[in-house]
Amino acid sequence: MSELQTTPSPEIRLKENISKKPETMTKIFWEKFSKNKLAILGAVILFIIIMSAVFAPLIAPYPQEQQSLLDKYKAPGLEHLMGTDKFGRDIFSRILYGARVSLLVGFASVVGSILIGTVLGALAGYFRGIVDAVIMRVVDIVLSIPDIFLLITLVTIFKPGVDKLILIFCLTGWTTTARLVRGEFLSLRSREYVLAAKTIGTKTHKIIFSHILPNALGPIIVSATLKVGSVILAESALSYLGFGIQPPIASWGNMLQDAQNFTVMIQAWWYPLFPGLFILMTVLCFNFVGDGLRDALDPKNIK
Amino acid sequence: MSTLLEVNNLKTYFFRKKEPIPAVDGVDFHISKGETVALVGESGSGKSITSLSIMGLVQSSGGKIMDGSIKLEDKDLTSFTENDYCKIRGNEVSMIFQEPMTSLNPVLTIGEQITEVLIYHKNMKKKEARQRAVELLQMVGFSRAEQIMKEYPHRLSGGMRQRVMIAIALSCNPKLLIADEPTTALDVTIQAQVLELMKDLCQKFNTSILLITHDLGVVSEAADRVIVMYCGQVVENATVDDLFLEPLHPYTEGLLTSIPVIDGEIDKLNAIKGSVPTPDNLPPGCRFAPRCPKAMDKCWTNQPSLLTHKSGRTVRCFLYEEEGAEQS
C-alpha cells in the first residue's frame, strides 16, 4: 500500500471535539438501567434464585425425594424451613430443586423460540414477498390455536418430560418473536446504512445478521426476558393440571397441584403458599427486569 | 484518456400495477479514467436511479433495467449476477451517500465498519486491516485515528462521518467513486473541505468520480464535465467551462439563471416555471416543452434526439438542428 500518503493534510484536519474516554454502549446501558430501582431489585432476587437453583444440592438440607411419613405436614420451623408435605418431604429442598426445573424450562424454551423466531422473522422482513407471506401465514396458523389446548394435546401425544416441554414451548413460542423481528426488519432494511453496506459489497447474510440484527437486538432481549416469566407460568399451569413435570420430580407447578385440597390448604397453609410465592416472585422479577431493559435499551429514551 | 465507464441507452423502469414507469429513459454517457463528471438535474430527473443502476442496486428497490448496457472497462455490468456484483461493489466501484448521519451503522464501531471492507475485498487479516484502517482515517484528516476506530457513529459530527464514509469508499482503491449529493447535508464550510478532500484523494488514486448533485456551485468547483438530466434523459453534455459560459439547452439556461448572484442587482430570482412532470405522465413531445420559454410547434409533438453540436457538445433540443448539427 505504498501509493498512499498517510500523513493528514493540515488544511483538512478538523477539530475533533471528542472527550477522552469513548462512551461505550455498555456504559450508557448501565447508567440507564441502574436508575430503575425495581429492575435492580428484580435482577438481584433473580440472581439469588438462579444461584440457589444451580447450587441446589449443596444448599438443600434434604434430598428432594426423601420421605419421612412420621414428619408429614410439619409446620415451618428450624428443622424444616418451609415445613413438610404429605409424605414428609422438606418443602424448602423441593422448592430449590423445583427452581431448577422451572428455570431450565423457562430459559431453554425462550432461547429456542427466540432463535427460531428471530431467524424466520429476519428472513420474512428482509426478503418480503413470497418468503414473508409463507412465514407469516404459518405464524397466523400457530397463533390461531389456543396455546394451552395445543400444549395439552402435544403433551398427551408425547410423554411429558422436561425435554418434551421445552420442545413444545419452542414450537409454540416463536411466533410472537417472529412478528416482532419481522416488523423491526421491515423498517430497518430500508435504512441508508443498509444500502451503504450493500454498496461496499457486503453479502446478504452478513447484512441480515451483522448489520441489521444488532439494531433489532433491544426489542428481542426485552421480549425474551418477559417471555421467560410467561413460560414459567405456563409450565406451572401445565404441571398443575398434571400434564407437565411428573412427580416425584419436583416442580413449582406440581407442588401446587399436590396441595390443592381444601383440608390441606386449611391445615397446612405453608404447603401451597411457598411454591405459589416463588412462582409469583420469579415471574414478577422477570417482568421488572424486562421493563428495566426496555427503558435502558430504547434509544429514544435519552437522559 | 481511456474510457472507464460507458453507459449506453440505459433504461431503468419501475412498475406500478404492471404499468411501466420510465425513471431512466435512454441515458448515454461515459466517464474517462481520472475524470470527474457531474450529473445534474432537479429532483426526480433520474440521477440517483442512474447511479443505483450502475451499482446494480435498483432491483432491491423494485426497479428493473429494461435495456441498454453499462460497461466498466471491458465488463458488462448488466449481465452480472448478484455474486459478481458483490465482488466489484466497494472494490472497483464504491459510493458515498447524501446523509452521513444515517449511512453509518449505529451499532458498529467506526473501526468495525472500515475493516469489514478490507477483510472482505483484500483478504486482509484482522490486525492488518486495523492498521490499514488507521492509515485511512489519518488520510481523511483524523489526527487521533486510533481513538476514532473505537467510537460509535453517534459520537461524530456530520462532517466527520462523511470523512469516515470517504475513507470506507476509498479503502480498496476503487476505479470509480459515485458520490450521491455528498455535501448536501453538510454546512457550507464543511462542504468545501469534504469536496476538496474527495478531489485530492481521487487524484492521488486516479479514481474517477461520478458526482451527483443539484448544486451548481459544487459542480463548478469540482467537476470536469457536466451531464444535465431531465425526466430520465440526458439533455446536455458539456465541459464545465462551456456549460457555464454558454448553456445550450433552455433547461440548462434556466438552471443557471436561477442561481442567486451575490453582487447581482436582480431583485427577483428567475425560476423555471412549472414543475418536473412525473415519469408516468410525460408529455408526448419534448419533455421540457411545457416549461420551455423557447418551445416551438414541433416541440409539442416530436421528441428531439441527442444532437452533437458543432462545438462537440451534445444537446437534446430542436433549436440546434438547423445550426448544422448532426444526429448522433
Swiss-Prot record, chain A:
Its membrane topology: Multi-pass membrane protein
Protein name (database record): Oligopeptide transport system permease protein AppC
PROSITE patterns associated with the record: ABC_TM1
Membrane spanning residue stretches: 39-59, 103-123, 138-158, 165-183, 212-232, 269-289
Role description: This protein is a component of an oligopeptide permease, a binding protein-dependent transport system. This APP system can completely substitute for the OPP system in both sporulation and genetic competence, though, unlike OPP, is incapable of transporting tripeptides. Probably responsible for the translocation of the substrate across the membrane.
Annotated keywords: Cell membrane, Competence, Membrane, Peptide transport, Protein transport, Sporulation, Transmembrane, Transmembrane helix, Transport
Coiled coil location: none
Domain of life (superkingdom): Bacteria
One GO CC term on file: plasma membrane
GO molecular function terms listed in the Swiss-Prot or TrEMBL record: transmembrane transporter activity
Listed GO biological process terms: establishment of competence for transformation; peptide transport; protein transport; sporulation resulting in formation of a cellular spore
Record flagged with keyword Protein biosynthesis: no
Species: Bacillus subtilis (strain 168)
Domain spans labelled ABC transmembrane type-1: 99-290
Entry's family note: Belongs to the binding-protein-dependent transport system permease family. OppBC subfamily.
UniProt-listed CDD domains: TM_PBP2 (cd06261)
Main subcellular location of this protein, as a coarse class: membrane
Subcellular location: Cell membrane
UniProtKB/Swiss-Prot annotation, chain B:
Cellular location(s): Cell membrane
ABC transporter domain ranges (all copies): 5-256
Gene Ontology CC: plasma membrane
Keyword set includes Metal-binding: no
Residues holding ATP: 41-48
Pfam families referenced in this protein's UniProt entry, alphabetically: ABC_tran (PF00005), oligo_HPY (PF08352)
Principal localisation: membrane
The keyword Membrane is annotated on this UniProt entry: yes
InterPro entries with a match to the protein in the record: AAA+_ATPase, ABC_Ni/Peptide_Import, ABC_transporter-like_ATP-bd, ABC_transporter-like_CS, Oligopep_ABC_C, P-loop_NTPase
Bilayer topology: Peripheral membrane protein
Record SUPFAM superfamilies: P-loop containing nucleoside triphosphate hydrolases
One GO MF term attached to the UniProt entry: ATP hydrolysis activity
GO biological process: establishment of competence for transformation; peptide transport; protein transport; sporulation resulting in formation of a cellular spore
Keywords recorded for this protein, A-Z: ATP-binding, Cell membrane, Competence, Membrane, Nucleotide-binding, Peptide transport, Protein transport, Sporulation, Transport
Physiological role: This protein is a component of an oligopeptide permease, a binding protein-dependent transport system. This APP system can completely substitute for the OPP system in both sporulation and genetic competence, though, unlike OPP, is incapable of transporting tripeptides. Probably responsible for energy coupling to the transport system.
Family to which this protein belongs: Belongs to the ABC transporter superfamily.
Name this polypeptide is given: Oligopeptide transport ATP-binding protein AppD
